[in-house]
């Protein structure tokens, strides 16, 4: 039997829940689990806000494309699907209502979500992504950031 697929979930994207994004690098505390995907579990306690801000910067700097979006937002889903059609596997950071101050250094205005970081630099929101796609500037930008190889 096939497994049921939850809406807005794809096996080709890595969705990082807002509660546990900061466990990508287990530098602050040793991990008791030997699984390499232990940072995906939502039952992990939140580290302090100082390490939250430092680790959110690491997520942006270590990945070619990062999308910050509200949890369950259709605009974030559109941005993710557009990047997937270009062959890019973006890291999607879903920000919930409980994550009020954890992303202040990355997302300055929560009203303008979703926000994309390409190559460690702020690319803009969905409007900028769509404009670059229509103008033909998106593919060269993704190649320059290392998100596309061909």
Curated annotation (Swiss-Prot):
Residues 53-149 form the Glutaredoxin domain. PROSITE patterns: GLUTAREDOXIN_2. Residues 31-44 have a biased composition (Low complexity). Its main location: cytoplasm. [2Fe-2S] cluster binds at residue 73. Disulfide bonds: none annotated. A motif (Responsive for interaction with TGA factors) lies at residues 147-150. Belongs to the glutaredoxin family. CC-type subfamily. PANTHER family: GLUTAREDOXIN. This is Monothiol glutaredoxin-S13.
């Amino acid at each position: 039997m096939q497994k049921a697929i939850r809406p807005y979930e794809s096996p080709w994207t890595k969705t990082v829940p807002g509660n546990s994004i900061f466990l990508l690098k287990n530098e602050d505390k040793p991990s008791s689990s030997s699984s390499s995907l232990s940072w995906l579990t939502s039952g992990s306690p939140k580290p302090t806000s100082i390490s939250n801000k430092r680790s959110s910067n690491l997520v942006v700097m270590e990945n070619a494309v990062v999308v910050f979006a509200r949890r369950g937002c259709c605009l974030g889903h559109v941005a993710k699907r557009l990047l997937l059609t270009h062959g890019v596997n973006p890291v999607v950071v879903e920000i919930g209502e409980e994550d009020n101050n954890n992303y202040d250094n990355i997302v300055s205005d929560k009203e303008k979500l979703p926000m994309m970081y390409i190559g460690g630099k702020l690319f803009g929101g969905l409007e900028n992504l769509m404009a670059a796609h229509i103008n033909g500037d998106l593919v060269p930008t993704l190649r320059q950031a290392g998100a596309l190889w061909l």
